[in-house]
């Protein structure tokens, strides 16, 4: 069965993990946002050593493409592409918003009113979020996009009972809405990432190394150093 290397540096906490047969067998995390780049290589070496694996035994590399931290996305994808290219292994791209929806489905109250939708949201500073809406089986309803939240916009998106998940939910709790809303104070874990990655692995859905890039959802402005 497939052995995967999972790299996630999209958000504040970075994750590097190894999986086998769709289950996490080892992982390391790093909460120091500014050191994610150094953490990745050190973590990979440590995990391979503890599992007595050679990196050539890895069947594919899975990496979060975003949305999330611009810098985090760049360093994570650069590392993943470098490994995939060197080893000639497939690269699997993962969405952070889809991962949140995948997580929400596991946490949905059993008596949740049907039908319902899942609103994944990641903090994008000020009153803006990166968001997407999914149905009860993770099919997209509203495509991933940057959203400026206000009462009018919020109510235009909530047409039915809604489960909100992600670190952007704090921006919505005080906004009045007509529909029932449940807030899940949760984030995805490495296990959700590997389960999503295995779906793509089994389907043969891999990224083209020449063209894949971070999914920023917003234009990136880089200020030249003086």
Summary of predicted features, one role per range:
Residues 60-96:
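DPxDG-like acidic metal-binding loop motif
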Residues 31-39, 70, 74, 78, ...:
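Residues at secondary-structure transition points
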Residues 1-65:
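N-terminal beta-alpha supersecondary unit
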Residues 47-51, 86, 104, 190-201:
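Stable alpha-helical structural segments in soluble proteins, enriched in small hydrophobic residues
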């Amino acid at each position: 069965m497939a052995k995967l290397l999972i790299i996630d540096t999209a958000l504040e906490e970075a994750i590097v993990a190894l999986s086998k047969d769709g289950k996490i067998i080892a992982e390391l995390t790093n909460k120091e946002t500014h050191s994610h780049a150094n953490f990745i290589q050190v973590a990979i070496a440590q995990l391979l050593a503890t599992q007595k694996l050679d990196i050539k035994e890895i069947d594919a590399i899975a990496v979060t493409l975003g949305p999330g931290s611009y810098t985090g996305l760049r360093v994570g994808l650069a590392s993943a592409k470098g490994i995939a290219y060197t080893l000639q292994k497939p690269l699997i791209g993962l969405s952070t918003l889809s991962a949140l929806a995948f997580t929400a489905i596991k946490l949905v109250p059993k008596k949740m009113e049907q039908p319902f939708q899942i609103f994944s949201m990641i903090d994008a500073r000020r009153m803006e979020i990166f968001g997407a809406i999914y149905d009860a089986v993770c099919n997209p309803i509203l495509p991933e996009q940057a959203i400026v939240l206000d009462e009018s916009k919020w109510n235009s998106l909530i047409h039915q009972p809604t489960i909100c998940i992600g670190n952007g939910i704090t921006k919505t709790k005080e906004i009045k809405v007509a529909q029932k809303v449940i807030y899940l104070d949760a984030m995805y874990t490495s296990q959700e990432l590997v389960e999503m990655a295995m779906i793509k692995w089994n389907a043969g859905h891999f990224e083209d190394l020449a063209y894949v890039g971070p999914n920023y959802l917003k234009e990136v402005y880089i200020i030249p150093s003086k």
